[in-house]
Swiss-Prot record:
Entry's family note: Belongs to the arginine N-succinyltransferase family.
Task performed by this protein: Catalyzes the transfer of succinyl-CoA to arginine to produce N(2)-succinylarginine.
SUPFAM superfamilies per UniProt: Acyl-CoA N-acyltransferases (Nat)
Enzyme Commission designation: 2.3.1.109
Inducing or repressing factors: By nitrogen starvation, and arginine. Induced at stationary phase by sigma S.
Biological processes, Gene Ontology terms: arginine catabolic process; arginine catabolic process to glutamate; arginine catabolic process to succinate
Name assigned to this protein: Arginine N-succinyltransferase
Binding site residues for succinyl-CoA: L125
A GO MF term: N-succinylarginine dihydrolase activity
NCBIfam families, sorted: arg_catab_AOST, arg_catab_AstA, PRK10456.1
Enzyme class: transferase
Keywords associated with the record: Acyltransferase, Arginine metabolism, Stress response, Transferase
Amino acid sequence: MMVIRPVERSDVSALMQLASKTGGGLTSLPANEATLSARIERAIKTWQGELPKSEQGYVFVLEDSETGTVAGICAIEVAVGLNDPWYNYRVGTLVHASKELNVYNALPTLFLSNDHTGSSELCTLFLDPDWRKEGNGYLLSKSRFMFMAAFRDKFNDKVVAEMRGVIDEHGYSPFWQSLGKRFFSMDFSRADFLCGTGQKAFIAELMPKHPIYTHFLSQEAQDVIGQVHPQTAPARAVLEKEGFRYRNYIDIFDGGPTLECDIDRVRAIRKSRLVEVAEGQPAQGDFPACLVANENYHHFRVVLVRTDPATERLILTAAQLDALKCHAGDRVRLVRLCAEEKTA
């Protein structure tokens, strides 16, 4: 059974294996053991209530409960940009016009922005390619909404998610090549690694401070503004069906889109509800897949179950109850996996 649980110190080697499969561009999952260990430690301290809000971040893993294999990772940053500035570009417009010459030009322009400061962030979503089946991607991504719904007071009103931009298998980013490299004088992979390992001071020191006309970029770079990496397209679709939208903010490195949504308008958060759980043999039938989560902050668990999402009393097997760390009579959070039945 596939189960979402909080990360543990013993997961570091599994996270290193996952990091080696990302193909680059996933800044928050670098193949660096010291950085990953520090990330795990920060998550543990967040759960223990030892960190200020500006440093809090939760990390979860997707585990096969039968084999102990860690198949994926996802995370939530509680409030971005309160310690280090959180940069992106806002894609806007500057108008240059002359009535005398009968000239009017509306030029797409990139404006450096810290507009999302303080927002909660969905991040570090990666599923091992070998496990991209049977709804695992949906479970991994949407499990975070169950945690946010259960512990709403831990998070801010707006949620953002940076989507990985277009980058090829050799680490070539058209957007970086045309813009970032001119100011940072390093390859995309180097800048990505520095940022992922927490060495972010160079961003504020070197990045351009003035608006940038996109027409000055290569056509290849212009074409990838707001576009996602092919492997990230499914993750974008998942978030958009939950209510997230692209509001013309992009990543400063690869030009990938930043999606955003008011937390209380996220479908899975808004429609999730608490039901009593009982042990038994679940009813047979053509039921949709549903997310089921316990309400245990320190021992949070989420699984996928096929059931009636409108039920008031959820019947689970002993194995499912054990995976959820629940007992008969407990209340669990339930929501349909998708607005319409899908298979990952």
